């Protein structure tokens, strides 16, 4: 019996750990073929939307959702999660390619992501861009504690 309890505990912990390590990624463009960054990666990961020095976490880079003048960050672009009327908001995919819905500020979009953190990003963008890494650290600290 003790052996079964240990096996059960190992299975549960393994499942929790695997779920915690799921990497959610954004893809943009009409065909969703442009990588836009990792949503739940660290601020040190150059592929993270939270890394100021990377391609996807800078307010100045072309493929960053934080670039308010860019194709993927403008509130006027059909490819931006911050445009309520966007025709092609970026899908959120996990590392296995499973869809987690679309990152969009449009709460009426039936395909909007069901992930509360993804939706929080679209709703708190103005606060986030003031200090992207600090926002990440605050939110992920709360999430992990």
Q: Model segments located where?
A:
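Beta-strand-rich domain onsets/edges
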Residues: 16-18
């Amino acid at each position: 019996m003790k052996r079964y309890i240990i096996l059960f505990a190992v299975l549960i912990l393994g499942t929790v750990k695997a779920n915690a390590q799921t990497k959610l990624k954004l893809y943009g463009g009409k065909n969703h073929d442009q990588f836009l960054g990792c949503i739940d990666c660290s601020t040190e990961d150059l592929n993270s939307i939270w890394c100021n020095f990377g391609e996807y976490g800078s307010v100045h880079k072309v493929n960053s959702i934080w670039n308010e003048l860019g194709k993927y960050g403008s509130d006027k672009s059909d490819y931006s999660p911050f445009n309520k009327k966007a025709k092609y908001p970026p899908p959120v995919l996990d590392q296995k390619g499973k869809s987690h819905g679309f990152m969009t500020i449009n709460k009426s979009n039936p395909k909007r992501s069901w992930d509360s953190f993804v939706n929080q990003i679209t709703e708190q963008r103005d606060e986030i861009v003031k200090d992207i890494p600090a926002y990440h650290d605050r939110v992920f600290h709360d999430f992990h504690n």
